[in-house]
A protein has these predicted regions:
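TPR-repeat structural position
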Residues: 23-24, 182, 458, 492, ...
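Alpha-solenoid helical-repeat scaffolds
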Residues: 327-506, 511, 518
Length: 675
């Protein structure tokens, strides 16, 4: 008996052959699969497909001509794929080696070969009782493990699910999504397209998300099912697809963001850093953490301890169950005597986008504690960690966020995760898929590109912008985004070109001028940078930070007196601004005015405010160049090694010898070892 993994390879190879119109090869693979599946109905289907294809080949080889042969090919491929998936499913059920087969077998024990009448009868009889949750789980398993549908079943299940309450609808729609994920079923996808018109926003968001992800998974097959593509015709989905795209990108960024936060925390040098520096690093990391949560990034995606330890989530159907506080096992939590605590829990869930599986796991963890004080403390901590997740979020966005986060957790952490392919394995950038482009408007495309750029995926955003520029008239906004892509890819000259064009279309746009300033500074084109800074100064004559940049630019152009006069002007308005004092010292040093540099550095160090990270480096450079090595070493000692090594370039620009930098490195290392 061939093992399931080998049979899955045979199935995939046969499917690939059929999709490439290598029909004889695909039928050969299907025949190999059928040897493990002695089902007479499927054997007859295979024989009919083979006979039809043989007759077609014979007819054409004899000089026959059939203008509909392409349609016949598509029909035969479609029938062969249907037979292939049906055979693979029956083999899987017969082996009883995984959760899918086990769920189907439990239904068989209850209702025989067709358990639907039994389960539906139980459902009707148990309305309004606590037992209905168990039957609801059976309904889920029934839909999850159901064979491929025909049109009659699509209509029947649509009618049944549509008349259930919103929570039940969500649960059963989830079962249909999971079933279609196991095996491609065009009728189930048509069902999802129909139920996506629901007036219930939660059901609509779930259905549309599942449908889009399934279409992405089965994109190579879509040309054989034209009815699936026409199901979208005339429907205005751009706004909802934009919300979905946003959440899909955020979900992709979640693992990277979570890892980055962990690395930031691990990178804090508690041994060599001062308490103020440690506090500064921790505060900066936590600020970034909260900013990511507000943005919608699922920062705790990989922290799944509660999910893995949950007894409730050991059942597959519970991963797709919308949160329902009426479930019997939750009653102890929500009807405790201390009603304030229960109300607080409701408020937490009501005003957060925390997905259903998280809520169930949180409640289960709380129920394991008998100490109400402990529960209150946990509740406060949990609320503080997730309350920002919905700040300024619109309701529709909340629904899509909860759905995407829930589904992502299912395919990453559920007991079924290792037994089925994730719906997130496909490319989830919607504009890259031709069949979805007609549904996306310009705004959706631009927002997608903005998000990709924001998360440093500019290499993905730029081709989309190029494609959009060929389809529509080029705007200043589009050019700005294209310039930003080139900027982030380090193509500074190309970035200047795009920003310059944007400036021509939308003259004196502040953001565009700021980016040109950055590019010219990087390219050391100081004359052009000065022109841009002067244009910005006209817009904001009292901007002292802009004056600092102007002084820096003038210094590079050798206009030392003008640069220092500007810095002195800034000092008049900010006499004790630590950044201003350090900048004056640093600029004076670069201009060769060591006396001025020494004066302003002493003035800065006399202030009680602790040195910030960049300020510490500037102060160390000044101390070093004016010959105060010991003071410079004290400043350099707590900095990370990579930060110190990066100081080579600015110090060299200030005239500090390369060999002296090597000495400085060894002296710093000795000082760190002594500490």
């Amino acid at each position: 008996m061939t093992d399931l993994s080998t049979l899955n390879v045979i199935r995939q190879q046969a499917a690939d052959a059929l999709l490439s119109y290598r029909i004889s090869e695909g039928l050969f693979g299907l025949e190999a699969l059928m040897r493990e599946c002695p089902d007479q109905q499927l054997s007859n289907a295979l024989e009919n497909i083979r006979d039809s294809y043989t007759q077609m080949l014979h007819f054409l080889s004899q000089g026959g001509h059939d203008e509909e042969r392409a349609d016949i090919q598509d029909r035969l491929v479609r029938q062969a794929l249907h037979t292939l998936d049906s055979a693979a499913r029956l083999i899987r059920l017969s082996r009883r080696e995984d959760l899918y087969a086990h769920a189907h077998y439990q239904l068989f024990l209850l209702g025989g070969q067709d358990a639907a009448p039994y389960v539906l009868q139980q459902w009707d009889a148990q309305q309004g009782t606590a037992e209905r949750y168990e039957t609801q789980d059976l309904l889920f398993d029934l839909l999850w493990t159901t064979p491929l549908w025909d049109q009659r079943q699509t209509a029947s299940w649509f009618e049944f699910i549509s008349r259930q309450d919103t929570l039940v609808q969500q649960h059963l729609v989830g079962a249909v999504i999971l079933s279609a994920c196991e095996y491609m079923d065009a009728e189930k996808l048509i069902f999802l397209s129909l139920i996506a018109d629901s007036e219930q926003p939660e059901v609509r968001a779930l259905s549309l998300t599942g449908l889009v992800l399934l279409l992405l998974k089965y994109e190579p097959r879509l040309s054989f099912y034209p009815a699936l593509l026409t199901a979208f015709e005339g429907r205005k989905l751009a706004d909802e697809l934009s919300l979905l795209q946003r959440e899909l990108i955020l979900m992709q960024e979640s693992p990277k963001a979570s890892q980055a936060i962990a690395q930031e925390m691990a990178g804090i040098d508690f041994v060599h850093s001062t308490p103020q520096q440690v506090e500064e690093r921790i505060r900066a990391t936590m600020k970034r953490y909260r900013a990511l949560i507000v943005e919608g990034v699922d920062i705790d995606f990989h922290k799944a301890t509660l999910l893995h330890s949950s007894q409730f989530l050991r059942r597959i159907s519970h991963w797709w169950a919308p949160f329902d506080e009426s479930r019997p096992f939750l009653q102890e939590l929500f009807i405790r005597k201390d009603g304030d605590m229960a109300e607080g829990l409701r408020q937490m869930f009501q005003h957060s986008a925390d997905c259903s599986v998280n809520r169930y796991a949180i409640c289960e963890a709380m129920l394991s504690h008998s100490d109400v004080t402990s529960i209150d403390k946990q509740l406060t901590q949990l609320w503080e960690s997730i309350e920002a997740n919905l700040t300024d979020a619109i309701p529709q966005q909340v629904y899509f966020r909860s759905v995407v986060q829930n589904m992502a957790r299912f395919f990453a952490h559920s007991p079924l995760a290792q037994q089925t392919e994730s719906l997130f394995a496909s490319d989830t950038c919607l504009p890259r898929h031709a069949f979805l482009r007609p549904l996306l408007n310009r705004q959706t495309m631009m927002q997608t590109c903005q998000m990709l750029i924001h998360f440093h995926r500019e290499a993905e955003a730029f081709p989309l912008l190029q494609q959009l520029s060929r389809q529509e008239s080029v705007s200043a906004e589009m050019l700005r985004l294209m310039g930003r892509c080139q900027q982030q890819m380090g193509q500074w000259q190309k970035a200047v070109s795009f920003f310059t064009q944007a400036d021509l279309l939308d003259e004196n746009d502040t953001w565009t001028l700021q980016q040109l300033n950055v590019c010219y500074e990087r390219l050391q084109r100081h004359a052009e940078r000065l022109d841009v800074l002067q244009r910005l100064e006209v817009q904001a004559p009292d901007d002292l930070d802009l004056s600092l940049q102007l002084a820096d630019c003038l210094a590079h152009l050798g206009r030392a007196d003008e640069a220092l006069n500007l810095l002195y002007k800034v000092e008049l308005y900010r006499p004790e601004d630590v950044t201003v004092l350090t900048t004056i010292a640093h600029s004076a040093l670069r201009l060769g005015r060591t006396d001025v540099a020494r004066k302003y550095m002493q003035k800065r160090l006399s202030l009680s405010a602790p040195l910030q990270s960049e300020e510490t480096l500037m102060a160390a450079r000044v101390q070093l160049v004016i010959g105060r090595w010991r003071e410079a070493l004290q400043l350099y000692a707590p900095t990370p090694d990579e930060t110190f090594e990066a100081e080579r370039e600015p110090l060299t620009a200030l005239g500090f010898p390369e060999k002296d930098f090597a000495l400085l490195r060894d002296m710093r290392q000795q000082l760190r070892e002594k500490k």
